Amino acid sequence: GIGGAGMSAIATVLAAMGHHVSGSDLKASAGLERLRALGIDVTVGHRTENVGAVDVVAVSTAVPSTNPELVAARDRGINVVGRAQILAAIAARRRTIAVAGTHGKTTTSSMVAMVLRAAGVDPSFIVGGDVNEIGGGAAWTAGEWFVVEADESDGTFLELPAEVAIVTSVEADHLDHYGSAAAIAEAFARFLHSAPCTIVCADDAVAARLGAEAGAVTYGTSPDADYRIDALVVERAGARFRVVHDGAVIAEVSLPIPGAHNARNATAAVVTAVELGADLKPVVEALARFGGVARRFQFRGEAGGVTVVDDYAHNPGKLRAVLDAAGHGGWRRVVCVFQPHLYSRTAAQGVDLGAALARADVVVVTDVYGARESPKPGVTGMIVAAAAIDARPWRRLAYLPHRGDIVPYLHDVLRPGDLCLTLGAGDITSLADDLIPMLASRTGR
């Protein structure tokens, strides 16, 4: 799975550290070409012969135990490790800043890395998305700090040796692994208690409670936050705000990306810089030019008066944040195409997903993108669609389980001045490749 965002970032860092790295993925991609350019031996397709004379085989969570390369490695007695074990080994070589949360961690970890880089801290980093400023999600430097996105999905984020632990949010996600909201909250509590320095968003109820128990430094719009977001203005093209600490304004921030959630993410980066003793002037300057992360409110194009934006949002908290940002843009309408991700998440959170989508003016729900999971009887995108209708019965909604029906439907629905959002962690991101040419070819709209 070397082509995925997380594994490709790890491969990049391992190669920069001087290791010989090879890997495979199911299909060709720009990410694979980028790895090849770094001298990494990349193969398309999973085959036994790909496992050469190696010491360690690292595997992503998306790879099944029946994968031929994985089977071959185990048969030969090669050490097989997961993503978290590799990350922990890398983190052990540096002072580590780990960013966790059920939403916001990719953008926050990217911002932390970029502002510390600007402030001369020169951190190494691995994040779960391509940072637009550098065209990738990883770097290995001579600096003493390492910024890492800590994935909570399977509990392995607890293996990271964090000196600074940041929690952006905690909601009842990944219930296929944790089983309950209480269990995931307990995992985050352990994460916070394992680090000597903890930074937590005060605007998230569960995170704030866990932070109080851990003695964390807090940030957010809450009046109780140690670092308070003040005078927040959210617009189509960005956000402006001040950071207040101990009654004094310590930073005036102008972001080129929209959303109150991104103001929170940026404030987490400011707080981290303060905790590390960095100069805030270059930090604020870095945030002013922060170009975002791939698939996080990413502008894909404009045609026929319609703006198309893609986002990775796939749980209720992420959907609410993205649609809140869209709501401040002054668009004629917000038209949302949502692809549910994982059967387990759809079964557990379908009602909440639908309620979050009710913020849009027009909603299209596709069938579930199963990823690593097999279909479950009775679990389809219709669960989400029905919940969205229940939440706002007068809103226009279509359930279109077949991908080929979506663009023709949008041909008849979209109007100049609309924002069209494609949302989900699956292959819905490629819809823009078909949608934008269609919009460009229309006449009379």
Residue ranges and their predicted role:
Residues 1-40, 53, 57, 65, ...:
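ATP-dependent carboxylate-amine ligase
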Residues 25, 121-133:
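Short beta-strand-centered segment that lines the nucleotide-binding/catalytic pocket of NTP-utilizing
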Residues 32-34, 50-59, 63-82, 87-88, ...:
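Acidic, Mg2+-coordinating active-site environments of NTP-dependent enzymes
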Residues 61, 127-128, 169, 202, ...:
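Short secondary-structure boundary segments
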Residues 97-99:
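Hydrophobic anchor at the beta1->P-loop junction of P-loop NTPases
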Residues 106:
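Residue-level recognition of phosphate/Mg2+-coordinating polar/acidic sites
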Residues 139-142:
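Conserved motor-coupling elements within RecA-like helicase/translocase cores
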Residues 145-153, 308-314:
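Switch II (G3) loop of P-loop NTPases
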